[in-house]
């Protein structure tokens, strides 16, 4: 973790030998924009288009050569993160590749304005500017989180603010160098490559702007609310004029873990309720913050200054979800809003997700199902919807389901889960894998599973019933091998899941915990490869009388069903 107390490198001039150099046979160096311990950023001219661009290259000092592999990994991670995003409030990637000496580089748009770090040291921001800044950062974070990207190092120097835009204040999130990819787009089942393990950068976060779970290196707890904590730190500094905690690096880290947040002394023009909003962002436990950026954004709406347009209104985009808005198919793709006239180099083609084009009738029908389940009464038929998309490989079934997955997440409408199936079954197939991913438990042992669930569910040590459910969930997620006795974990309980009925009861209870007060979106990818037990579970979900609201969307290949009568009959029955 970075121990420096400042996070804004002063702009410097490039060395004389670098000015005029053409990198990657395309980008002519104009000057240096800044540098850090492991990289340098240049202002360049794209000789192919004439555009001004920012080129970031990895540069490892000789005395830190042993970190080259790790830093190279995180540089590629940043490229993958930026390439997967397409939002007006996030810096846009244009190219990625390797220079002649083998070091990786990433080319991005040059952004107007100055960093929030510079603004807050030179200007007192008006309340209307602060409101727009927070709203737009929340919009960008919601987009990133829905695509599995956690920034991990949000701070004033990583947010640009343009006050000269004709559309009003514009904020941009940049520098995803420590981005955490929660569910990479690459499917290791396609080429046999091992799935990348979740890991935290050895320097994750910057002192003063880092969440308690990052300080504790509690990887399972890192998620959307981690970035929201960092945003709370930024808001505190902008509103109050000082950081949340001050002192030595160690004192600040210790305070972020344990010390209550000092009261906010707000300027007179700031609504009183903003103090509680910031306090919620800065809660020590992630599950006490807003669960999604969209939740925070809806709460932030209450403080909007009079006549202040929302981000979508300013950008001529369709408003966010409500039960009465038009279906998503009528909204312009974000790429159409920000990509006009820009040229992308082929280096990003292997990293960028294919855009979803057309398919308006299908998207409208899917969105209608989302709306119906979202406003339904628990326990009614409409609160449990199931949709199957069947077609040949390559027609876009999974991309359509993924689009819906991202939309319900970005707008905070449902809790999205993805259950995947392969020809060779693995322990993380299906709903088991989806729940493991949701709780960040893919690499956790049984003890860690129980510890995480006890934390997340805030189980009272004296509550035998809740502890039993923890043990039952751990047994479902980490089954005891036949002929052995399940270990006694932190719950102090043992639970045997030995019948389909009991297994279903556990699954239903877990899904209720996952959904809490909102519906669950459950995507079954390649359902034709699943076992009969999965179809039985779906049938039980359809008949369930619990408070669970769920939209299940399944994709299956028609050519596979044509040669597998049993699977075809199960799909037909569903």
Task: List the predicted regions and their residue ranges.
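Conserved N-lobe ATP-binding subsite of Hanks-type protein kinase domains
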Residues: 40
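C-terminal lobe helix-coil module of Hanks-type protein kinase domains
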Residues: 45, 135, 160, 208-312
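AlphaC helix of the eukaryotic protein kinase fold
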Residues: 59-84
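Hydrophobic/aromatic scaffold residues of ePK-like serine/threonine protein kinase catalytic domains
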Residues: 84, 133-134
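Activation-segment/catalytic-loop signature of the eukaryotic protein kinase fold
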Residues: 96
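Conserved short submotifs of the Hanks-type protein kinase catalytic core
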Residues: 101-115, 119
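Protein kinase catalytic-loop region centered on the HRD/HxD motif
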Residues: 138-149
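Key residue(s) within conserved catalytic/signature motifs
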Residues: 153, 175, 270, 290-574
């Amino acid at each position: 973790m970075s121990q420096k107390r400042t996070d804004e490198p002063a702009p410097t001039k490039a060395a004389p030998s670098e000015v005029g150099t053409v990198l990657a046979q395309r980008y002519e160096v104009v000057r240096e924009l800044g540098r850090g311990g492991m990289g340098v950023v240049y202002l360049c001219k794209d000789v192919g288009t004439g555009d001004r661009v920012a080129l970031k290259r990895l540069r490892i000092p000789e005395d830190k050569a042993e970190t080259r592999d790790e830093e190279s990994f995180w540089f590629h991670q940043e490229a993958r993160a930026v390439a997967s995003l397409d939002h007006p409030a996030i810096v846009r990637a244009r190219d990625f590749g390797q220079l002649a000496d083998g070091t990786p580089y990433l080319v991005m748009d040059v952004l107007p304005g100055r960093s929030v770090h510079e603004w807050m040291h030179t200007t007192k921001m008006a309340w209307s500017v602060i409101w727009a800044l927070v709203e737009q950062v929340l919009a960008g974070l919601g987009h990133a989180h829905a695509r599995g990207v956690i920034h991990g190092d949000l701070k004033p120097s990583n947010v640009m603010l343009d006050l000269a835009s004709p559309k009003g204040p514009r904020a941009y999130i940049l520098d995803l160098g420590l981005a955490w990819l929660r569910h990479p787009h690459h499917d290791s089942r396609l080429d046999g490559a091992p799935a990348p393990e979740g890991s935290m950068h050895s320097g994750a976060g910057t002192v003063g702007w880092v969440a308690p779970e990052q300080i504790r290196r509690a990887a399972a707890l890192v998620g959307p609310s981690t970035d929201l904590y960092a945003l709370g730190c930024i808001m505190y500094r902008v509103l109050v004029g000082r950081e949340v905690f001050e002192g030595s690096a160690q004192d600040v880290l210790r305070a972020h873990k344990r010390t209550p947040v000092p009261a906010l002394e707000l300027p007179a023009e700031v609504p009183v309720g903003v103090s509680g909003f910031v306090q919620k962002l800065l809660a020590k436990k992630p599950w006490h913050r807003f669960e999604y950026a969209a939740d925070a954004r809806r709460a932030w709406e209450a403080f909007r200054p009079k006549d202040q347009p929302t981000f979508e209104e300013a950008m001529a985009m369709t408003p966010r979800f409500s039960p009465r808005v038009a279906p998503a198919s009528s909204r312009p793709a974000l790429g159409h809003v920000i990509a006009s006239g820009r040229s992308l180099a082929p280096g990003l083609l292997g990293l960028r997700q294919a855009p979803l084009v057309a398919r308006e009738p299908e998207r409208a029908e899917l969105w209608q199902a989302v709306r119906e389940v979202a406003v339904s009464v628990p326990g009614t038929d409409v609160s449990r919807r199931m949709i199957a998309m069947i077609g040949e490989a390559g027609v876009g079934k999974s991309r359509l389901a993924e689009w819906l997955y991202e939309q319900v997440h970005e707008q905070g409408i449902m809790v999205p889960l993805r259950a995947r199936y392969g020809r060779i079954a693995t322990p993380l197939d299906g709903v088991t894998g989806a729940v493991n991913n949701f709780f960040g438990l893919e690499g956790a042992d049984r003890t860690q599973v129980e510890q995480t669930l006890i934390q997340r569910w805030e189980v009272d040590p004296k509550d035998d019933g809740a502890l039993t459910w923890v043990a039952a969930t751990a047994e479902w997620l980490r089954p005891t091998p036949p002929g052995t006795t399940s270990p006694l974990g932190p719950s102090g309980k043992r639970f045997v899941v030995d019948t389909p009925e009991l297994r279903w009861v556990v699954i239903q209870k877990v899904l209720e915990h996952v959904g809490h007060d909102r519906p669950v979106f459950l995507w079954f990818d390649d359902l034709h490869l699943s076992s009969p037990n999965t179809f039985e579970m779906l049938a039980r979900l359809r008949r369930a009388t619990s408070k669970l609201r769920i939209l299940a969307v399944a994709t299956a290949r028609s050519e596979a069903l044509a040669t597998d009568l049993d699977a075809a009959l199960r799909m037909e029955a569903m």
